[in-house]
């Protein structure tokens, strides 16, 4: 970090992201998941560096991925910590941003007494946060229910638990015997850039047909 810090402010942003290991590593270089103590050390070092960069250049420059805080068992920083959210694509600040945007959107809603019950498939890592956010909406929408399913990633295996790498067959296998109520919502981040297929070449239609339900693909702003 300090070597890169010499090039600030030309070096504008650095993301510290734990290695993601699939279950298919035969013959590859031996890597392992970080231990909680190691993740905590990484966060401490990044924060010390960030405070100095903030003093010198007005920006922390280095930010740890949300996953590092989860591994370390430490609370995530709040919204203001992440400045311009330059590293969202690397999983840095996504939790703080989602909490802020959800609270903002909820504050502008009047609420209603309509009844509905849908299901939502997501990665295992995101499921607890989504359930937490939904609890905050109950006062305004007491009769609207959304059951969140954190889908284990069988395709990639290992420690892969992010939503964007969940495949169609993972969803089908995990939800085959579970209640889906009025339909299943899928985040579009699960789909390739063309928004028509999962990484395993299955489609939302395949999921709908296999699970005998209606599938709704929700955009990043939905």
What are these regions (language model features)?
Residues 1, 13-35, 119-124, 149-161:
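Conserved strand-turn element in the central/C-terminal portion of the radical SAM core barrel
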Residues 1-27, 37-67:
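Conserved C-terminal portion of the radical SAM core fold
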């Amino acid at each position: 970090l300090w070597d890169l810090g010499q090039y600030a402010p030309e070096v504008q942003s650095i993301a510290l992201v734990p290695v993601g290991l699939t279950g298919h590593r035969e013959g590859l270089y031996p890597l392992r998941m970080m231990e909680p103590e190691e993740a905590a050390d990484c966060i401490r070092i990044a924060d010390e560096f960030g405070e100095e960069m903030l003093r010198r250049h007005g920006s922390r420059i280095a930010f740890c991925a949300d996953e590092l805080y989860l591994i370390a068992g430490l609370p995530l920083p709040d919204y203001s910590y992440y400045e311009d959210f330059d590293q969202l694509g690397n999983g840095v600040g996504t939790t703080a941003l989602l909490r802020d945007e959800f609270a903002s959107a909820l504050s502008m809603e009047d609420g209603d007494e309509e009844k509905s019950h849908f299901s939502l498939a997501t990665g295992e890592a995101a499921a607890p946060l989504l359930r937490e956010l939904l609890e905050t909406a109950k006062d305004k929408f007491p009769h609207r229910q959304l059951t969140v399913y954190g889908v284990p990633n069988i395709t990639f295996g290992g420690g892969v638990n992010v939503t964007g790498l969940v495949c169609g067959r993972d969803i089908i296998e995990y939800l085959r015997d579970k209640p889906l109520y009025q339909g299943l919502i899928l985040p579009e981040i699960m789909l390739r850039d063309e928004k028509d297929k999962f990484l395993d070449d299955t489609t939302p239609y395949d999921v709908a047909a296999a699970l005998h339900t209606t599938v709704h693909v929700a955009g990043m702003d939905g």
